[in-house]
Curated annotation (Swiss-Prot):
Record family assignment: To M.jannaschii MJ1173.
Name of the protein: Uncharacterized protein MM_2549
SUPFAM superfamilies the UniProt entry points to: RelE-like
Protein source organism: Methanosarcina mazei (strain ATCC BAA-159 / DSM 3647 / Goe1 / Go1 / JCM 11833 / OCM 88)
InterPro entries: RelE/ParE_toxin_dom_sf
UniProt superkingdom: Archaea
């Protein structure tokens, strides 16, 4: 199993989200647990961002993450509306 890292910029987004929409944050954290079990299950982004993977949250949001095999870690890179993230 992998362990979780969160970029500081994303952590501040999550703090704001905790105040605005706590249920959405709970969904994200549950999805992060699924990612940690099998991060290679999810789809890679296209070049030039093909070192990143993505997973949809609800219908309109995307969580982008990277995998570091050496340290067995998953880093949550970004989270935003589908139209803004790419």
């Amino acid at each position: 199993m992998y362990f979780l890292k969160i970029r500081s910029e994303l952590d501040s987004k999550f703090e704001k989200l905790a105040k605005k929409n706590k249920k959405q944050l709970e969904i994200i954290l549950a999805k992060a647990d699924e990612i940690l079990e099998n991060p290679h299950r999810y789809k890679n982004l296209k070049a030039p961002m093909n070192h990143l993977k993505r997973v949809h949250i609800d219908k309109h949001f995307v969580l982008v993450f990277s995998i570091d095999e050496e340290s067995r870690s998953v880093t949550l890179e970004d989270y935003d509306h589908h139209d803004k993230i790419y």
